[in-house]
Amino acid sequence: DLLNSKSILSDPMKDANITGFYLAYHNQNDIKLSKKIAQVYLEKCPSLAFEAKKHTIPQKGFGKYRVGFLSHHFYDHTIGKLYRGFIEHLDRKLFEVILFRTSKRKDALAITIEENADQVVHLRTNLKSAQLAVSSKKLDLLFYPDIGMDSFTYFLAFSRLAPVQVTSWGHPNSTGIPNIDYFVSSRDLEVDTGDSHYSETLVRLKNPPTYYYRPEIPEGSKAPQDFGLPSDAHVYLCPQTLFKLHPNFDSILGKILENDPQGHLLLISGRYKSEENLLLDRFKKVFPKAINRVTFLP
């Protein structure tokens, strides 16, 4: 209906601000929907398809490759943790690393990531301004770790700002965006028919495209009884956002508890109590005898 209407989006950030983020969590091939969403935005807001032609021709010569990393989440966030080491350890004999940030958040991890880049550019959350700022760096490759998690970087990704534009599984779904060329994943994360799930060319690496540092363990580690569990409890922690737990996963959790009578499942509390109640209702249908061994942590 939107494609057939005569409506125009003068500013998709204000007029729509939808990225299709939640599609990744219903266990279906979303390629048609992702491409349709992108098509609607391009039809209704043609300026999204900005192309900096004079800066998107591969640079000739024998200098370093100029690689840009662009995300809202380069701070103490999952994305910051996944890509901190990746940015730090790229061979500087081959690559010049330019970091593009859309968040003003400054914490210890944000400072570390910035220190590991050769240049840092703080982008205004204005599409035209950001398009010009990124394209002016004459990149050889632009890497978006997490298209779809933040609406501004999602809409910016519609532009052609570098000869090669890449995303990865910071958000585990195809963008459907024509100007994103490659989706970098891992062999162990993709099914045999995975290519058909992406509008991008799927690249299967041997290992995930991250460099993850071991988390620092805080002092004063807690014992099971600190969480109201028996002292001999076997603790299974699943610290994932509750809406990401697909019903197909319920039986796996149930089997773990059924096969380990001392097992206790710890989950992170949701933003709303109703999320926990809905999840418990699901669990009761799948593993009712072990439901009393499920605990939500505040």
Regions inferred by a protein language model and the residue ranges of each:
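Short, intrinsically disordered, charge-balanced linker/junction segments flanking boundaries
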Residues: 1, 294-298
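Alpha-helical solenoid repeat scaffolds of the TPR/TPR-like class and their adjacent stem/linker regions
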Residues: 1-229, 281-289
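Short acidic (Asp/Glu) and glycine-rich catalytic loops that position anionic groups and cofactors
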Residues: 13-18, 232, 257-263
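Conserved donor-binding/catalytic core segment of Leloir-type glycosyltransferases
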Residues: 65-72, 230-246, 250, 254
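Short beta-strand segments
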Residues: 69-71, 98-101, 143-146, 237-240, ...
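Short, contiguous acidic/charged loop-to-helix segments that flank catalytic cores in large enzymes
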Residues: 74-77, 122-123, 240-245, 267-274, ...
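Conserved strand-to-helix beginnings and helix N-cap segments that scaffold or border functional pockets
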Residues: 80-81, 110, 247-250, 276-277
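A conserved nucleotide-sugar
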Residues: 94-96, 254-292
